[in-house]
Amino acid sequence: MLNHNIKYEWITLVREKWIVILLLLFFSITLFAVRNGNEKVEDRNLSITKEQEKVVKLDAEFTADIDSVTRKLKSPPKKSWLDPRSLSNIAWDAPRVVAMEAVPLALVSTGQSDLFTHYAKPKIYGEAYTLGFSELSNPVQLLFGSFDLAFVCIYLLPLLVLAFSYNILSADKESGVLKLTFSQPVSVYQWLLSKLALRYVILSSIVMISVVAALLFYGVSVADNFSAIAKLFALVLSYMLFWFLVAFVVNLFGKSSGNNAVTLVSVWVVMVLLIPSVISQLSNTLYPVPSRINMIHQYRVAEAEADKNANEILKTYYRDHPELAPKDTTKENQYAWILSYFASSELVNNSVKPILDKYDKALAKQQTWVDNLRFLSPAILLQNSLNDLAGTSTAHYADFRNQVIVFADVWKGYFKPRMFANEVMKAEEMKDIPKHTHNSENVRNHFASDLAGMIFFVFAILATSWTIYRKYTVAGILSI
């Protein structure tokens, strides 16, 4: 009986032509969403490439100028700060680009990428934590978010599922067909589950075909990224299954189509909109982040105080670091103007460290709060994992920020001892300047835990549906 039921359900769906319409509609939406994501990725890669090309050009110019001065083909400038061999010139004018390259699936989810910059250029002067890691963006766009594949899957796909499953039982009941159907030896539970299963298979196929086609159209290799795409489908299909089962439970109550629609939309609002908003707001309330403006202000105040006592601080610094003390005190160091900065920077950093630590701890607590409570909503689980797959999660940008700070110390560490030794740059040394390679392997991946959370929701809804069916059938409430 169930086989006949599925067969005739398929024939009915095909005759209504909604499968073709759904395929075209969802493919169009998916293609548009992936196009939007691809545009952002292309802009991101273009901006990084431009900065990297500037560095290559500057290196070539410095190398040529240094070689010309060294070989006396060109007279050295009278002022040291104009000399191409000056370490301070290279350290300030030709900083390396610390870039956060986009991963292949970055076009899937915008995540935090519209809030943070994807590259930084630490210099010899200034501290890395004072760099601007925030991107200048249209505030209206930030308010409404980005229409990407993640948005389609998290917000629109559940509505599509509910639209084609809210009245499966009620429509037949209202038309009088249901009594004829149940004159056959089949339970309402099996009958309804089989019809929803068919719709799930159809919609899942449409989703997978649309997503793969859109990714291929915009140059994402399925073979090279098979593992990531498989994870994407595992998450999205589990998310869809959850919403089909929610519709299954609501249909089991045997209410009218209008009642079902209102109930399902209410569940969507709570799960997709309300719970994530409440968690986000509570994280900001419970763990407020200190003002970044105040942190930079404190840094500048400490810097101004250090400037007043620069000479004394430098003498103390030489006592603490005798290896950097000048060996020939009769010769003036051409970098004297910046050596006092190096000496005072440690003092300044120590004065602002408590504020910086408080800032980092508050951010960490906020993220921990959200991570722990993400299991309250499958929408948060899906968003979290899609951001991980796209490399646009909060954790990815926090890791990038830390890498910038570490490389800033490496950059200074290369030039600082040489400046204290009053050295100059040689043409052949330009190739030995430190470079940075971004690596996000240390960023924690939440795929396994998020998928487990999604599966838990699926089994919880299944258990709820069976409990409701048994209870209502025994009580005689579930009437056909």
Language-model segments: which ranges?
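Secretory targeting signals
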Residues: 29-41, 54-60, 133, 139-148, ...
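Transmembrane alpha-helical segments and their membrane-interface loop/helix boundaries
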Residues: 1-140, 268-480
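Hydrophobic alpha-helical transmembrane segments of multi-pass membrane proteins
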Residues: 149-156, 165, 233-238, 452-456
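A structural motif at transmembrane helix-loop-helix junctions in multipass membrane proteins
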Residues: 16, 21, 237-275
